[in-house]
């Protein structure tokens, strides 16, 4: 699943192309995604200028004068910028939505169709009040926020990172990597982690996400950036998907456990 770095990599790749450009038309080939593409979506965007593209958690928010169209990549989604040749490149089976500009096509592909393309009209208020965005955690977050919101919670610190209401956009890969960098065992109860340790964790999360963005995200199966290139952060992971391999720091075998139906990787020596 694309996590925050992959979504930010996509945003940075797309915005220079679309900001200040008008959508000539929209082709919706598959309306039944995770939620249905709104009726009349293509007509609402015809000849609209894209003002900017921002990210909130794992959502991409494309602002036009009449509102915002919101894109979520789901489990397997990608947004790619393709040259608008004559004719435009033919869509494949899982290419569900095209935004046609004068010189290029922005194409949404999603084999599993867990992604979404939604519309938030300006007269409905600020887009950040949209039901899918309003409950997301704070960006950027702080150690004090982590510490305060986890008091009394018995859930593991890794599961707290994944919950989305405290820290937004940190998925399974980056939670495991951040906990390793902070030296915190993922099974530790979130409410028992001290403020100094949360300070290390907050720094580790920020550094891990920044490194992942710089490396184009992680490509484990489907993700490619807007230019079609794979990310390579996964090649430098300390613990993720390295069960049984030696720790890059101490040499101890990396362990794998399951938490909340997701695989967790950690070093039993470096993480306490």
Swiss-Prot record:
Q: Which domain of life is it from?
A: Bacteria
Gene Ontology terms for molecular function: 8-oxo-7,8-dihydroguanine DNA N-glycosylase activity; class I DNA-(apurinic or apyrimidinic site) endonuclease activity; damaged DNA binding; zinc ion binding
Would the keyword Hydrolase turn up in this protein's UniProt record? yes
Q: Which stretches are zinc fingers (FPG-type)?
A: 238-272
Q: What does this protein do?
A: Involved in base excision repair of DNA damaged by oxidation or by mutagenic agents. Acts as a DNA glycosylase that recognizes and removes damaged bases. Has a preference for oxidized purines, such as 7,8-dihydro-8-oxoguanine (8-oxoG). Has AP (apurinic/apyrimidinic) lyase activity and introduces nicks in the DNA strand. Cleaves the DNA backbone by beta-delta elimination to generate a single-strand break at the site of the removed base with both 3'- and 5'-phosphates.
The Swiss-Prot or TrEMBL record describes its family as follows: Belongs to the FPG family.
Q: What is this protein called?
A: Formamidopyrimidine-DNA glycosylase
């Amino acid at each position: 699943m694309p996590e925050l770095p992959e979504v930010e990599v996509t945003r940075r790749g797309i915005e220079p192309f679309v900001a200040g450009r008008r959508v000539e038309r929209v082709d919706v080939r598959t309306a039944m995604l995770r939620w249905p593409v709104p009726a009349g979506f293509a007509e609402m965007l015809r000849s609209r200028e894209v003002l900017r593209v921002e990210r909130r958690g794992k959502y991409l928010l494309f602002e036009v004068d009449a509102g915002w169209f919101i894109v979520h990549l789901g489990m397997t989604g990608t947004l790619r910028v393709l040259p608008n040749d004559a004719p435009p490149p033919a869509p494949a089976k899982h290419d569900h939505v095209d935004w046609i500009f004068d010189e290029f096509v922005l194409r949404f592909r999603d084999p599993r169709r867990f992604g979404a393309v939604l519309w938030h009209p300006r007269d409905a208020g600020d887009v950040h009040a949209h039901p899918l965005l309003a409950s997301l955690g704070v960006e950027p977050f702080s150690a004090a926020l982590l510490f305060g919101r986890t008091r009394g919670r018995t859930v593991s610190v890794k599961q707290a990172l994944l919950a989305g209401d405290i820290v937004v956009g940190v998925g399974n890969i980056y939670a495991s990597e951040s906990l390793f960098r902070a030296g915190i065992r993922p099974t530790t109860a979130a409410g028992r982690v001290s403020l100094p340790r949360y300070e290390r964790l907050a720094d580790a999360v920020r550094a891990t996400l920044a490194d992942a963005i710089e490396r184009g995200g992680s490509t484990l199966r489907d993700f490619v950036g807007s230019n079609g290139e794979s990310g390579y952060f996964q090649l430098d992971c300390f613990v993720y998907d390295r069960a049984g391999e030696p720790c890059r720091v101490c040499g101890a075998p990396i362990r794998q456990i399951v938490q909340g139906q997701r695989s967790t990787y950690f070093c039993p020596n470096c993480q306490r």
